[in-house]
């Protein structure tokens, strides 16, 4: 089956943040027309292969790391540029990136047709193991249990990690369950959760071999 072009570009400017996001759910070439960055903050979350382009610049290293993992294992191409009020804290940057990513995902996905709709993913990272289940249901709901104990990982507040996932489910209008089943290192617990979510999303948006809406209602989103 030939996929529709599932791409989107989102620009969001507020008094707190400036964000630009380009996304393609099936990888390939993407670009941002006019960069808002004077220069890249870091090359840590930057990767270009024959099938994906990923460049994440939020100013928060651990957030960049998590977004990079999500994009890589979802099969997305993703460019994120963000200038946030980090002199205050990480809240607005994380929240507004989340808003932009959710908007971009929903816009790129478009009508839910010809896809599996449901996705399940497991991902280990050393001692940590996480599970994610996704339903492209148009019924936003999230149950998140990561069991994080630290206040921060790098410069990212741990309370913002489940908040981002809950907000993603609400704005993207998906049902989302993400659990870290075991693990004692909060970095590993978080990263395995984002990777499990990526695996689940990749399955949910993959072709089911038809052009049908995967619902007894005949419509989703």
Curated annotation (Swiss-Prot):
Stored InterPro entries: IGPD_sf, ImidazoleglycerolP_deHydtase, ImidazoleglycerP_deHydtase_CS, Ribosomal_Su5_D2-typ_SF
Pfam families attached to this UniProt entry: IGPD
Pathway given in the UniProt record: Amino-acid biosynthesis; L-histidine biosynthesis; L-histidine from 5-phospho-alpha-D-ribose 1-diphosphate: step 6/9
Record SUPFAM superfamilies: Ribosomal protein S5 domain 2-like
Keywords, alphabetical: Amino-acid biosynthesis, Histidine biosynthesis, Lyase
Molecular function terms from GO: imidazoleglycerol-phosphate dehydratase activity
Catalysed transformations (reactions): D-erythro-1-(imidazol-4-yl)glycerol 3-phosphate = 3-(imidazol-4-yl)-2-oxopropyl phosphate + H2O
Positions of transmembrane segments: none
Enzyme Commission number: 4.2.1.19
Family: Belongs to the imidazoleglycerol-phosphate dehydratase family.
PROSITE patterns (UniProt xref): IGP_DEHYDRATASE_2 (PS00955)
UniProt record, GO biological process: L-histidine biosynthetic process
Protein name: Imidazoleglycerol-phosphate dehydratase
Organism the protein comes from: Kluyveromyces marxianus
């Amino acid at each position: 089956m030939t996929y529709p072009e599932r791409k989107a570009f989102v620009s969001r400017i507020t008094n707190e943040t400036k964000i630009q996001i380009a996304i393609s759910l099936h990888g390939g070439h993407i670009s941002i027309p006019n960069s808002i960055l004077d220069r890249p903050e870091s090359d840590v979350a930057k990767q270009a292969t024959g099938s994906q382009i990923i460049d994440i610049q939020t100013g928060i290293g651990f957030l960049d790391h998590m977004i990079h993992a999500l994009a890589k294992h979802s099969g997305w191409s993703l460019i994120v540029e963000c200038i946030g009020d980090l002199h205050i804290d990480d809240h607005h940057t994380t929240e507004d990136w989340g808003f932009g990513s959710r908007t971009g995902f929903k816009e790129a996905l478009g009508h839910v047709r010809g896809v599996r709709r449901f996705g399940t993913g497991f991902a280990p990272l050393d001692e940590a193991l996480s599970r994610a289940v996704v339903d492209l249901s148009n019924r936003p709901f999230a149950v998140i249990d990561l069991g994080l104990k630290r206040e921060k990982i790098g410069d990212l507040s741990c309370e913002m990690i489940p908040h981002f996932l809950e907000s993603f489910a609400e704005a993207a209008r998906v049902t989302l369950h993400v659990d870290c089943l075991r693990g004692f290192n909060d970095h590993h617990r978080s990263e395995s959760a984002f990777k499990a979510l990526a695996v689940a999303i990749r399955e949910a948006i993959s072709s089911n071999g038809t052009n049908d809406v995967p619902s007894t209602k005949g419509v989703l989103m």
